[in-house]
Design a protein with these regions (language model features):
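Generic alpha-helical secondary structure signal
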Residues: 13, 17, 65, 69, ...
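Polysaccharide-binding and catalytic clefts of secreted carbohydrate-active enzymes
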Residues: 1-21, 25, 39, 99-100, ...
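A conserved mid-domain beta-alpha-beta active-site/ligand-binding segment of alpha/beta enzyme cores
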Residues: 121-125, 131
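Aromatic-rich peripheral "rim/lid" segments of glycoside hydrolase catalytic domains that contact
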Residues: 129-132, 140, 144, 150-213
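Glycoside hydrolase catalytic-domain groove-lining segments
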Residues: 9, 13, 21-24, 28, ...
Length: 213
């Protein structure tokens, strides 16, 4: 909101102070590399960190035209500071139109206990759209030189497939379809079934690995 804009500099300063203190505490106990999954509003001072990271890896229809430029600028930020960069969150759900909405695609009506009870409209399951979106973004990240990426997410156990009329998984960004009260076909000992996005991710990295040998 507009009324909060004057507070942003103070919020960012306090955020950086808090993160700096947190880094000191963690480094006293942990010898590995550190990062923080940020959003643009945070305005993080990356000095204390080893990896520059963002959760803002989503491409919506509203900003698709500038998405490549945004990722290029993010990579340039890392190069300027001599640090690798990571996109710590990207993906979309498995319904038609989800790619345009990306992380803004909450189509579920929630009931008591954070339990899905219905949808906000009529939606059609479309695993190929989810898979295509992930492939397209992986191509962008790879071509622009992003060092590490993390798909959101492997599974949403709160958005399980119950029946054809209660297919809440179509609203899930999970790479697998969680099956309530059942087991998968490909992996019968698991409560989930790989979606098209699962295979798209595997195929991308299989091909990338082969090209780098």
């Amino acid at each position: 909101p507009q009324r909060l804009r004057p507070l942003i500099p103070e919020i960012r300063a306090r955020m950086s102070e808090l993160l700096g203190e947190a880094v000191e505490v963690v480094r006293a106990r942990f010898g590995g590399r550190l990062s923080y999954a940020s959003v643009p509003l945070d305005g993080v001072d990356w000095g204390p960190f080893d990896i520059i990271a963002t959760d803002a890896g989503y491409r919506t229809a509203a900003m698709a035209a500038r998405f490549g430029d945004d990722i290029r600028a993010f990579v340039a930020q890392g190069k300027a500071q001599g640090k690798p960069v990571a996109v710590t969150e990207f993906g979309c759900a498995a319904f038609r139109g989800a790619a345009d909405m990306a992380n803004r695609g909450d189509i579920v009506e929630w009931g008591d206990g954070a339990r899905p009870v219905g949808f906000k409209g009529e939606y059609v399951r479309d695993e190929e759209e989810q898979a295509r979106y992930i492939r397209e973004l992986l191509d962008v990240f790879e071509s622009e030189g992003v060092d590490n990426v993390f798909v959101y997410t492997f599974a949403r156990y709160d958005l399980a497939y119950r029946s054809a009329s209660e297919d809440f998984d179509l609203a899930s960004a999970g790479l697998v379809q969680v099956i309530q009260g059942g087991r998968g076909q490909r992996y019968p000992d698991m409560r989930w079934e790989p979606k098209a996005a699962f295979h798209a991710l595997a195929e991308f990295y299989r091909a990338l690995d082969a090209s780098q040998r």
